[in-house]
């Protein structure tokens, strides 16, 4: 496995949260808050506000969750510095071709109101994964995404991506 445990920690209020170092060197908190199944934007905003106030510093969302805008709005209003919040989002399978993936990445950034996303994942291993991955690589090179990876992908699917592409999935 290419995730390395580190002795580092992520700023989380008074709590010392361990981090893992992804294979590209990016440090990710091991504890996070996800907003899956919270499509009501006001509820999502309140949930993320409460999570940040409680000390969570990893926030997980996705295009399919339909709440990226609420997550971004909450981050913008928060007293927590952006650099102290690790944001994960995911590209949905309907955008798994090169052109749609590029548009999907930009749409996530726009909805979140962020200059970059810390970790951007391919949500599921269906469709033109190779084309979507190429778009993620380009976005990473452009500074729009810090780390890229796959979500709900088994080891075989990640190995296939690994063998064909320039940048390896974060694991």
Where are these regions (language model features)?
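Glycine/proline-rich, positively charged
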Residues: 39, 96-171
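N-terminal binding-site loop/beta-alpha segment at the start of enzyme catalytic domains
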Residues: 3-85, 141
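A cross-domain feature marking catalytic cores of carbohydrate-active enzymes
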Residues: 35, 61-63, 84, 89-91, ...
